[in-house]
């Protein structure tokens, strides 16, 4: 039955590249297109954030090439990775570029796709579940909740230079976005939280750090904007992590379904009769 389902999906052709999102960690969150590509690819160029269990779906004989990029650590240059995809495709391979999360959400998938266009290499984009949604769901934190917010902002915690992005209007986000989800923000969390507080956010606003989201190593720290930097240091947390700011963090007390599997008692009223401001 499952083979019949895969038989109806598009083929990964020789000389082409698929840019595929592997989701936030759990192999069960792979899409059918992603699993199908793993079954067909001759070469799989994968990121550091791709769960090794996902790679077990690769067909026998497939070549695995690591192209992981981690902030502050030695890693291949983006242009070199993009050109490697071109080289592999021109050699007649069926190439799978497998990226954690979604390739078009802070995954530099657009840059790689533009290089393929530049060199006239056929390609397909296969979206994945981004960690800023799926990873938070595994922590029991919804990015939207009708009583809390009508908008959410996704941002990166560092720019191409490795510094806090100076093109982000921190005051505007602080005043206008009830929920903020941040990727790659651990390194500069002190500066980022200071920017948000200076922009008008309450120092007591809840914040959650979800490290190694959707994996057996998942760890969640709940804190506040004012205590975030110190609490992260005290806990010894390391990237990768998703950071979420906003009242939705309080819902984890009721929606931590993984914790419930281990015996956590979930709260019936996670807001404990708190008066919430009108959703923005």
From Swiss-Prot:
Enzyme Commission number, as recorded: 2.1.1.107
Classification via Pfam families: TP_methylase
Family annotation (InterPro entries): 4pyrrol_Mease, 4pyrrol_Methylase_sf, 4pyrrole_Mease_sub1, 4pyrrole_Mease_sub2, CobA/CysG_C, Siro_Cobalamin_biosynth, Uropor_MeTrfase_CS
Outcome when changing residue 106 to A: Strongly reduces S-adenosyl-L-methionine binding. Loss of activity
Coiled-coil portions: none
Binding residue positions for S-adenosyl-L-homocysteine: 24, 100-102, 130-131, 184, 213, 241
Pathway in which the depicted protein is active: Cofactor biosynthesis; adenosylcobalamin biosynthesis; precorrin-2 from uroporphyrinogen III: step 1/1; Porphyrin-containing compound metabolism; siroheme biosynthesis; precorrin-2 from uroporphyrinogen III: step 1/1
Top enzyme category: transferase
Note: Uroporphyrinogen III is a key intermediate because of its position at the branch point of two divergent pathways. One pathway leads to protoheme, and the other one is the cobalamin and siroheme pathway.
Function: It is a step in the biosynthesis of both cobalamin (vitamin B12) and siroheme. Neither uroporphyrin III nor the chlorin (factor I) is a substrate of SUMT.
Complex formation: Homodimer.
Name of protein: Uroporphyrinogen-III C-methyltransferase
Gene label: cobA
């Amino acid at each position: 039955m499952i083979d019949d389902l895969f038989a109806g999906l598009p083929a990964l052709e020789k000389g082409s590249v698929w840019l595929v999102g592997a989701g936030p960690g759990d192999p069960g969150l792979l899409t059918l297109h992603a699993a199908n590509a793993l079954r067909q690819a001759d070469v799989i160029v994968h990121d550091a954030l791709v769960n090794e269990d996902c790679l077990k779906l690769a067909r026998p004989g497939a070549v695995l090439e690591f192209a992981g990029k981690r902030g502050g650590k030695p890693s291949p240059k983006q242009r070199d990775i993009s050109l490697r995809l071109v080289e592999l495709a021109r050699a007649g391979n069926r190439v799978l570029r497998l990226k954690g999360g979604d390739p078009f959400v802070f995954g530099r998938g657009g840059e790689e796709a533009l290089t393929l266009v530049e060199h006239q290499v056929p390609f397909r984009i296969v979206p994945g579940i981004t960690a800023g949604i799926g990873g938070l769901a595994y922590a029991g934190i919804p990015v939207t909740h009708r009583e809390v917010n009508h908008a959410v902002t996704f941002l990166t915690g560092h720019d191409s230079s490795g510094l806090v992005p100076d093109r982000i209007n921190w005051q505007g986000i602080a005043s206008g976005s009830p929920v903020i989800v941040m990727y790659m923000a651990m390194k500069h969390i002190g500066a980022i939280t200071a920017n948000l507080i200076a922009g008008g956010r309450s120092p007591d606003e809840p914040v959650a750090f979800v490290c190694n989201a959707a994996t057996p190593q998942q760890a969640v720290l709940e804190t506040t904007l004012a205590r975030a930097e110190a609490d992260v240091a005290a806990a010894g947390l390391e990237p990768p992590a998703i950071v979420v700011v906003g009242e939705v963090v309080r819902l984890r007390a009721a929606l931590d379904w993984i914790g419930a599997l281990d015996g956590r008692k979930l709260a019936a009223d996670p807001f404990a009769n708190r008066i919430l401001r009108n959703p923005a």
